[in-house]
Design a protein with these regions (language model features):
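Solvent-exposed loop/turn segments at secondary-structure junctions
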Residues: 10-13, 31-34, 85-89, 128-131, ...
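Conserved beta-strand hairpin/beta-sheet module of binuclear metal-dependent hydrolase folds
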Residues: 1-79, 206
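Flexible, acidic/histidine-containing loops and adjacent segments that form or flank the divalent-metal
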Residues: 1-3, 64-67, 72-79, 90-206
Length: 206
């Protein structure tokens, strides 16, 4: 089976995948307070936090993962993918959020999840300043990105986490690692990354 789990906290994106051999993949892990100004600033009404405002969205994600992680994962996530550096995908930052005692990064969203359920490999779009937008130099995005880098540095030293940049067209980034020979036809391909899109021809992109 290939399992797709959508973890709905009403505070941003989070998807959890279990590949046929038990390899795990987490895409995004948003986090925000129940009444967050940054998310409200997009002009859309916020849905009520799920299951309630009494628990952080990252804690909801962590609890869900602990329940569904397959035994073969040994309590870790094989691959995490951070699609981009916006708060509704990686977690927003506010002054009242706690700081990780050892790593010095703010605990929220993907940094909260990754500090409590180790990631073996993290894929992202690469540097915030590669093909930048106006958000790369203003607002909360640079602060979120620098906080993410602090987390990556700590997790690399503590858990051996590898940070990699996703490549459009690549079919060898997310691979089954437990018993791939049992599910040979199955594969995962990166279709787009950082402005590049797979052109449908082997591993090339444009």
């Amino acid at each position: 089976w290939f399992e797709i789990h959508s973890i709905n906290t009403a505070r941003g994106e989070c998807f959890f995948y279990i590949l046929p051999d038990g390899t795990t993949l987490l895409i995004d892990a948003a986090g925000a307070n129940p009444n967050d100004d940054e998310l409200e600033g997009h002009g859309y009404p916020l849905a009520p936090a799920k299951p309630s405002g009494d628990i952080s969205s990252s804690q909801v994600i962590i609890d869900y993962l602990h329940h569904y992680l397959p035994e073969v994962s040994e309590g870790k996530i094989d691959y995490a993918v951070l699609t981009h550096y916006h708060g509704d995908h990686m977690g927003v930052l506010t002054d009242d959020m706690p700081t990780h005692e050892d790593g010095g990064f703010t605990i929220c969203g993907i940094t909260d999840v990754g500090s409590r359920i180790p990631f073996k490999v993290v894929y992202d779009r690469g540097s915030l300043y590669d093909r930048p937008s106006k958000n790369s130099f203003s607002g909360a995005t640079p602060k979120r990105y620098e906080n993410y880098l602090k987390y990556i540095e700590w997790s690399s030293k503590t858990h051996g986490t590898e940070r990699r940049s996703a490549v459009a067209g690549a079919a060898d980034e997310i691979r089954m690692i437990h018993s791939p020979e049992s599910y040979a036809p199955f594969s995962v391909r990166t279709v787009a990354s950082n402005g590049n899109v797979w052109d449908g021809k082997e591993d090339r992109s444009s």
